[in-house]
């Protein structure tokens, strides 16, 4: 049997529920965008200021079908737009950026998606606070791959 429908006059008033923190007008709510740009993929991961609570995480590989396009600037832009939209829904209006390359004993240069992900966040209306490079730099590392004579082309 189908559930009974309520009469027109019996509806309770709907409450407005705010998901984000309560702030004054014109005040920015900050989050932290961790952008990890390697040459194989780009991660755009937004957390709260402590870094414990994930708000949204989207990768370039989630946005494009071809494996070769995962690290492309276009995929990074789409990922950043998705993240910015989710942040706005939750009331986050500004982001501190932590940019990271692969690092360690591998390349310390961010991949092709880093620049476009940052630009897409700014163009989506998010205010940018501090930009910091958090690529891991070894003080003395394990031996790098490639052998004694290096990679021969």
From Swiss-Prot:
Keywords: Ribonucleoprotein, Ribosomal protein. Pfam families: Ribosomal_S11. One of its GO terms (molecular function) is structural constituent of ribosome. It comes from the Eukaryota. One of its GO terms (cellular component) is ribosome. The keyword Metal-binding does not apply. One of its GO terms (biological process) is translation. The keyword Ribonucleoprotein applies. InterPro entries: Ribosomal_uS11, Ribosomal_uS11_CS, Ribosomal_uS11_sf. PANTHER family: 40S RIBOSOMAL PROTEIN S14/30S RIBOSOMAL PROTEIN S11 (PTHR11759). Belongs to the universal ribosomal protein uS11 family. HAMAP family: Ribosomal_uS11. This is Small ribosomal subunit protein uS11. The lineage of its organism: Eukaryota, Viridiplantae, Chlorophyta, core chlorophytes, Chlorophyceae. The gene is RPS14.
């Amino acid at each position: 049997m189908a559930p009974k429908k309520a009469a027109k006059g019996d509806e309770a008033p709907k409450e407005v529920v705010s998901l984000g923190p309560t702030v004054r007008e014109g005040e920015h709510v900050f989050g932290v965008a961790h952008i990890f740009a390697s040459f194989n993929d780009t991660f755009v991961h937004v957390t709260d200021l402590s870094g414990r609570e994930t708000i949204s995480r989207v990768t370039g590989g989630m946005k494009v079908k071809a494996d070769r396009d995962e690290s492309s600037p276009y995929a990074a832009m789409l990922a950043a737009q998705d993240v910015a939209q989710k942040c706005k829904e939750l009331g986050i209006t500004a982001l501190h950026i932590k940019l990271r390359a692969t690092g360690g004993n591998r390349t310390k240069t961010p991949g092709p998606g880093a620049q476009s992900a940052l630009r897409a966040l700014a163009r989506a209306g998010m205010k940018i606070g501090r930009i910091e490079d958090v690529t891991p730099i070894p003080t003395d590392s394990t031996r790098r791959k490639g052998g004694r004579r290096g990679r021969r082309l």
